[in-house]
Amino acid sequence: MGKVNEVLFMNRGEGEISYAQNSAFTQKVASMAMPALENAVETLFSKDFHLLQALTAADLGCAAGPNTFAVISTIKRMMEKKCRELYCQTLELQVYLNDLFGNDFNTLFKGLSSQVVGNKCEEVSCYVMGVPGSFHGRLFPRNSLHLVHSSYSVHWLTQAPKGLTSREGLALNKGKIYISKTSPPVVKKAYLSQFHEDFTMFLNARSQEVVPNGCMVLILHGRQSSDPSEMESCFTWELLAIAIAELVSQGLIDKDKLDTFNVPSYWPSLEEVKDIVERDGSFTIDHLEGFELDSLEMQEDDKWVRGDKFAKMVRAFTEPIISNQFGQEIMDKLYDKFTHILVSDLEAELPKTTSIILVLSKIVG
């Protein structure tokens, strides 16, 4: 697999398998987390920030779907509310949209309508800029951000976990692409270690960029269980591994490619997130919660229609990194196989998905 920061992005464009057309689930999660963002803006203005004429915010891992537009609109709306309450004449909002270099910034900025940013004659003038780069390192000057938002991005890792091959060079997680019930304990340990390292780097970078008393609102995939091999966090990757294994058995994929591939993502528990934040010591936890949603919440009665929609959603955020390892030419076959496996599982109850909302404040001093 190539370097993660070169191959990790959502499906581009606006076609039927694009992220822009298949982000309904993340939109629902974002809408449920919106009160946390509103409270964060409210909190900022309850401190000394009401003296500012401009608020600087960043949406990290913004992708190219409509979620980031809702974030901008929410911040702007809350600022307009505070502007009226505080009898401000005008305020300015500077928003930086960040993602890795492969992100579809063209589709993103094409979707930025006047309804999102408004015009420069309103109570709050909004200015938006793109910032390509990895959020695991520094992106902005010191003490330059008042508010940081990130939705469904922080659980991605900078690389596949280290230490997943033996001294003899043999793969330790054969036949799987993520943690599973059959994975040896070293796999779970390696994934947690990599997440700890990467999330700590994220917090360290933000601790230098966020002003004292500034806020961060982070939404990420997570789990309720202390066991990372439970299906609530492994379901999608387990089904993909089964689909890939079937193509291996048909001679369409080399077995070694499956055995040596491990997804650079980790869905942590609330306790793991809390522990890392407290160890870092740069931020206080204002709010931490996990909430469950159905993995497949759709109105259609036809299980094939539901299965196809879920498969397209999964394809939208997994295809670039999966195709880099296994080849673009077999992607249609792979996700067709994934759909068939999924539909057979629809007879049983599917696991719920846990999302974590984490609100942090930068410690003064």
Curated annotation (Swiss-Prot):
Pathway: Alkaloid biosynthesis. Its EC number is 2.1.1.159. The keyword Zinc-finger does not apply. Binds 1 Mg(2+) ion per subunit. Changing residue 225 to C: Normal theobromine synthase activity. Slighty decreased caffeine synthase activity with paraxanthine as substrate. Mg(2+) binds at residues 173, 259, 261-262. It comes from the Eukaryota. The record marks 149, 221, 265, 313, 328 as: Involved in substrate discrimination. GO terms for biological process: methylation. InterPro entries: MeTrfase_7 (IPR005299), MeTrfase_capping (IPR042086), SAM-dependent_MTases_sf (IPR029063). Optimum pH is 8.0-8.5. It catalyses: 1,7-dimethylxanthine + S-adenosyl-L-methionine = caffeine + S-adenosyl-L-homocysteine + H(+); 7-methylxanthine + S-adenosyl-L-methionine = theobromine + S-adenosyl-L-homocysteine + H(+). It is an enzyme of class 2 (transferase). The keyword Cell membrane does not apply. Keywords: Magnesium, Metal-binding, Methyltransferase, Transferase. S-adenosyl-L-homocysteine binds at residues 19, 62, 67, 99-100, 134-135. Gene3D superfamilies: Methyltransferase, alpha-helical capping domain (1.10.1200.270), Vaccinia Virus protein VP39 (3.40.50.150). Belongs to the methyltransferase superfamily. Type-7 methyltransferase family. Involved in the biosynthesis of caffeine. Catalyzes the conversion of 7-methylxanthine (7mX) to theobromine, and, to some extent, the conversion of paraxanthine to caffeine, but seems not able to convert theobromine to caffeine. This is 7-methylxanthine methyltransferase PCS1.
